[in-house]
Amino acid sequence: MCSAFHRAESGTELLARLEGRSSLKEIEPNLFADEDSPVHGDILEFHGPEGTGKTEMLYHLTARCILPKSEGGLEVEVLFIDTDYHFDMLRLVTILEHRLSQSSEEIIKYCLGRFFLVYCSSSTHLLLTLYSLESMFCSHPSLCLLILDSLSAFYWIDRVNGGESVNLQESTLRKCSQCLEKLVNDYRLVLFATTQTIMQKASSSSEEPSHASRRLCDVDIDYRPYLCKAWQQLVKHRMFFSKQDDSQSSNQFSLVSRCLKSNSLKKHFFIIGESGVEFC
């Protein structure tokens, strides 16, 4: 559990926790309408098959955060937890170079000074990492965005290790979810986490959109919740990623954004080029 978090906090830590977080409402106007913009405490899930642009979207949002305000960024810090060992620093640098009006090694280093990268190799490693993060959020009041790519990386390993007991299979991820909830709420963060499609859609899924909405985006949503309920209940906003099948648009991707707070459903198209994500 998260009992290890409970201790007396100093005045400095209290101020960092309550006052130091900048708003991320402007993180991507093309993706979030005003009423659906992420606010402190929000948890958003990017869901879809491999190769549908989820990690590229994370690079895009990371760049938006760590770029200086003079270059259209938010100038805030980001902590990126990589569980797939797929993070490409050169790719992030390339995106930054394309978005800076005058790119130089000094400016790139200045941007990357607001970026923190952590690797985790198992669900237990992830849990221990989350336990250790409180002091970091206390000492970095500009750290506003937590990214987890991906939360489903250890699903099959945990299933095997848990044997036939679903409770044991989900035990570590359930504790991770509880710690994520506490960190996000106590330190007024926004969390983006990716999950990969490994189950086929169930027609009776409780996550299915309404009949009218389903007609609009039926081909884009292939979702069946398979992670623990503790995680499912935390998500405020879910985005379903897919790649266009049309051979003429092999570089085009789409996502269906479902905000569970407002129950809104919107579809977006984007391409991925050398400079990163571009909305159509």
UniProtKB/Swiss-Prot annotation:
| Resulting phenotype, residue 16 to S | Does not affect function in double-strand break repair via homologous recombination as shown in rescue assays of XRCC2-deficient cells
Gene Ontology CC annotation, any one: intracellular membrane-bounded organelle
Q: Which residues carry this modification: Phosphoserine?
A: 10
**Predominant place of localization:** nucleus
Question: What happens when you mutate residue 270 to V?
Answer: Does not affect function in double-strand break repair via homologous recombination as shown in rescue assays of XRCC2-deficient cells
Give an example GO biological process: negative regulation of neuron apoptotic process
Extract the GO molecular function terms from the UniProt entry. Answer: ATP binding; ATP-dependent DNA damage sensor activity; DNA binding
The reported result of mutating residue 188 to C is:
Does not affect function in double-strand break repair via homologous recombination as shown in rescue assays of XRCC2-deficient cells
Q: Which domain of life is it from?
A: Eukaryota
Keywords (A to Z) from UniProt = Cytoplasm, Cytoskeleton, Disease variant, DNA damage, DNA recombination, DNA repair, DNA-binding, Fanconi anemia, Nucleus, Phosphoprotein, Premature ovarian failure
Subcellular compartments: Nucleus; Cytoplasm, Cytoskeleton, Microtubule organizing center, Centrosome
Pfam families linked: Rad51
Q: Which disease is it linked to?
A: Fanconi anemia, complementation group U: A disorder affecting all bone marrow elements and resulting in anemia, leukopenia and thrombopenia. It is associated with cardiac, renal and limb malformations, dermal pigmentary changes, and a predisposition to the development of malignancies. At the cellular level it is associated with hypersensitivity to DNA-damaging agents, chromosomal instability (increased chromosome breakage) and defective DNA repair. Spermatogenic failure 50: An autosomal recessive infertility disorder characterized by azoospermia due to meiotic arrest at the zygotene stage of prophase I.
Protein task: Involved in the homologous recombination repair (HRR) pathway of double-stranded DNA, thought to repair chromosomal fragmentation, translocations and deletions. Part of the RAD51 paralog protein complex BCDX2 which acts in the BRCA1-BRCA2-dependent HR pathway. Upon DNA damage, BCDX2 acts downstream of BRCA2 recruitment and upstream of RAD51 recruitment. BCDX2 binds predominantly to the intersection of the four duplex arms of the Holliday junction and to junction of replication forks.
Kindly state the subunit structure of this protein: Interacts with RAD51D. Part of the BCDX2 complex consisting of RAD51B, RAD51C, RAD51D and XRCC2; the complex has a ring-like structure arranged into a flat disk around a central channel. In the absence of DNA, the BCDX2 subcomplex XRCC2:RAD51D formed a multimeric ring structure; in the presence of single-stranded DNA it formed a filamentous structure with the ssDNA.
**The protein's name:** DNA repair protein XRCC2
UniProt organism field:
Homo sapiens (Human)
Identify the taxonomic lineage of the organism of origin. Eukaryota, Metazoa, Chordata, Craniata, Vertebrata
